[in-house]
UniProtKB/Swiss-Prot annotation:
Keyword DNA damage included in the entry's annotation: no
Enzyme Commission code(s) on record: 2.7.7.6
Protein name as it appears in the record: DNA-directed RNA polymerase subunit beta'
Species classification: Eukaryota, Viridiplantae, Streptophyta, Coleochaetophyceae, Coleochaetales
Cofactor field: Mg(2+); Zn(2+)
Function: DNA-dependent RNA polymerase catalyzes the transcription of DNA into RNA using the four ribonucleoside triphosphates as substrates.
Disulfide bonds: none
A UniProt-annotated Pfam family: RNA_pol_Rpb1_3
Signal peptide start and end residues: none
Gene Ontology BP annotations: DNA-templated transcription
Length: 661
């Protein structure tokens, strides 16, 4: 069984053939070892009972009914009993039927089959380690290509052909006869390698440390080469560098995790527990089954056929054996991933079978649907809406949701403060929503962060911590700048609320997961809290000026004078009193120089006004100033709007707050 204390995480990695056998093999009291599936049968057509040594065998996977063997005898069972009891007649263990959910079997392949994930998933790990192209590796795996096997003190096929290179007529007649005999076929099997066996031997001969050292030397040689000036050659060199880096990283991962490269070629194929690939009886004895059972059956059929051919290799043509090896490889490919294999296997309705990869991946896969999609306590869910008045690290939680989530904390404080005599009275006070409840709730959430999560959680910013604020309504309020990390918007998206309970979880949420501590993307280091969508539109509306160039507005502009203001406070006061609008043009007195203003040199001079005292007033498009006789500016006015002034004030406050931090 799965021990929660010893096994705290799940890791997916390559398993060795011995480890797969250890998962499945068990020894009966009579010394017989079970676990190997040798027959492609599932249930008997008449009795609907599992076939012996088949895909649903009770000797391998356990009894269908608790305490009842295949013979129908009931013996009963006791959990955690050191002595395991078996039926002497059928060899089935008297135990709980739940063991069929985790007991595995295995198929001993007659010929190694390459794992399609490491062959065809790009980039191909096998091709990277072997320094071969993907096309060459695929041709070798599917028996379209042969490799010579150099053996010490034994000639290989290529040397034999060179030795027989004579022009004598006798040799021309003798050689074709030799290459078509049985002796040559055995000679070819000894000297030539193809299929998964060739890949297995090449991978097993790799020395990972030596491969890493050689790859570093190749990288240094390529890095010393200068640009050739030819874009094609430069791209080719860069592509070679990328392949070398990929090979070094892959070899390091294999070496550090103590994984052998030859494990990417399967000689033992694990069989999933029968409860994970069920076969169900419906009306009138009709059976429906999982697609995995059909794919397993095809693997066993073809593997057994290959075993028969190899046992009769003297009378079986070599070409037929090679073709059967390819069929076994294609059957294993379809079982693991039926979408990327050479031959997509379909049922009688021309529907592709659902393979193992399709069952575990995706939103409805085994991991996200069954393992990650669990409902948990102290959690809630609601629609998100924008909260423009919130700080970056705050979120608005509806009062009803907060009362329900923090109910145990409220009850504890009510009893500790002697405001409620018992649990029942405390719950009654919460249901009546007495005023004291909200005071206690605000005190609790002040020092208790919450976690917000939006599915799918594709990276670590998909779940962040916030300081909760009680709000009215039924929706969760969120600062718009944190939407980038969640990939959320306010068009009906929902988010889940979780409460960290332990002190360790609360400390992690407060110091590592708060939204104001996750401003950069973990993928590329770029800022992720940037304004977008509604925020950009709001900034545009806030800072735009009144409409110009339209006839109906030109007449109003001529009638109304542009007001002058001395400082920000006068502008904000006039705006709050509704004397001016957000987009009305105004002249604002500027007390600094014009170096900070944009495009001051590019603006055209519209008008120069000369006064009797010798002063001059120069008027430009967005600013004007007064000069004395010595050409010194003493009064400067900027052409702006109240909206731009408000935006500038907020920007100054943010910069000053950042500098203080």
């Amino acid at each position: 069984m799965f021990d929660k204390q010893k096994n705290r995480y799940i890791r997916v990695e390559l398993a060795s053939p011995d480890q797969i056998r250890n998962w499945a093999e068990r020894t009966l009291p009579n010394g017989e070892i079970v676990g190997k599936v040798t027959k492609p049968y599932t249930l008997h057509y008449n009795s609907h009972k599992p076939e012996k040594d088949g895909l649903f065998c009770e000797r391998i996977f356990g009894p269908i009914k608790s305490g009842i063997c295949a013979c129908g005898k009931y013996h009963g069972f006791v959990k955690n009993l050191p002595e395991v009891k078996f039926c002497k007649q059928c060899g089935v263990e008297f135990t709980d039927s739940k063991v069929r959910r985790y007991r595995m079997g295995y198929i001993q392949l007659a010929y190694p089959a390459t794992h399609i994930w490491y062959l065809k998933r790009l980039p191909s790990h096998i091709a990277t380690l072997l320094k071969m192209s993907l096309k060459e590796v695929e041709s070798l795996v599917y028996c379209d290509l042969f490799l010579p096997r150099p053996i010490i003190k034994k000639p290989n096929l290529l040397k034999v052909k060179k030795l027989f290179n004579y022009d004598d007529q006798l040799w021309k007649e003798t050689l074709p006869r030799f290459f078509s005999t049985r002796s040559f076929e055995s000679f070819q099997n000894r000297e030539m390698a193809t299929g998964g066996d060739a890949i297995h031997k090449r991978l097993s001969s790799l020395n990972l440390q030596k491969l890493i050292f050689q790859s570093y030397n190749e990288w240094e040689k390529l890095s010393l080469q200068r640009s050739t000036g030819n874009s094609y050659e430069d791209k080719k060199i860069q592509r070679m560098k990328d392949i070398i880096i990929r090979r070094i990283k892959l070899a390091k991962q294999f070496f550090e995790n103590n994984i052998k490269p030859e494990w990417m070629v399967l000689s033992v194929l694990p069989v999933l527990p029968p409860e994970l690939r069920p076969m169900i009886e419906i009306n009138q004895g009709e059976l429906i089954t999982s697609d995995l059972n059909e794919l397993y059956r095809r693997v066993i059929y073809r593997n057994n056929t290959l075993i028969g051919f190899l046992n009769k290799s003297n009378s079986t043509p070599a070409g037929l054996i090679i073709y059967q090896k390819r069929l076994v490889q294609e059957a294993v490919d379809a079982l693991i991933d039926n979408r990327i294999g050479n031959q997509i296997m379909k049922d009688r309705n021309n529907r592709p079978y659902k393979s193992f990869s399709e069952i575990i991946e995706g939103k409805e896969g085994r991991f996200r649907q069954d393992l990650l999609g669990k409902r948990v306590d102290y959690s809630g869910r609601s629609v998100i809406v924008v909260g423009p008045s919130l700080s970056l690290h705050q979120c608005g939680i509806p009062k009803d949701m907060a009362i329900e989530l923090f109910q145990p904390f409220i009850i504890r404080d009510l009893i500790n403060c002697q405001l409620a005599p018992n649990l029942r009275a405390a719950r009654s006070m919460i249901q009546n929503q007495e005023p004291i409840i909200f005071k206690i709730l605000e005190k609790i959430i002040k020092n208790h962060p919450i976690l917000l999560n939006r599915a799918p959680t594709l990276h670590r910013l998909g779940i962040q911590a916030f300081q909760p604020i009680l709000v009215e309504g039924l929706a969760i309020r969120l600062h718009p700048l944190v939407c980038g990390g969640f990939n959320a918007d306010f068009d009906g998206d929902q988010m889940a609320v979780h409460i960290p309970l332990s002190l360790e979880a609360q400390a992690e949420a407060r110091f590592l997961m708060l939204a104001n501590s996750n401003l950069l993307s973990p993928a590329n280091g770029e800022p992720i809290t940037v304004p977008s969508q509604d925020m950009l539109l709001g900034l545009y509306v806030l800072t735009m000026s009144c409409k110009q160039g339209i006839y109906i507005y030109n007449e109003q502009k001529l009638k109304k004078k542009i007001p002058y203001f001395c400082n920000y406070i006068d502008v904000i006061t006039a705006y709050e009193k509704k004397q001016i609008n957000l987009h009305d043009p105004i002249w604002l007195k500027w007390y600094g120089n014009l170096r900070g203003t944009s495009s001051t040199k590019k603006q055209k001079l519209f008008e120069i006004q000369c006064e009797s005292r010798g002063t001059r007033r120069k008027i430009f498009e967005n600013w004007h100033f007064c000069e004395n006789i010595r050409n010194r500016k003493f009064t400067i006015y900027l052409f702006t709007t109240p909206g731009r002034i408000i935006f500038n004030q907020l920007l100054e406050q943010s910069i000053q707050a950042t500098v203080r931090i």
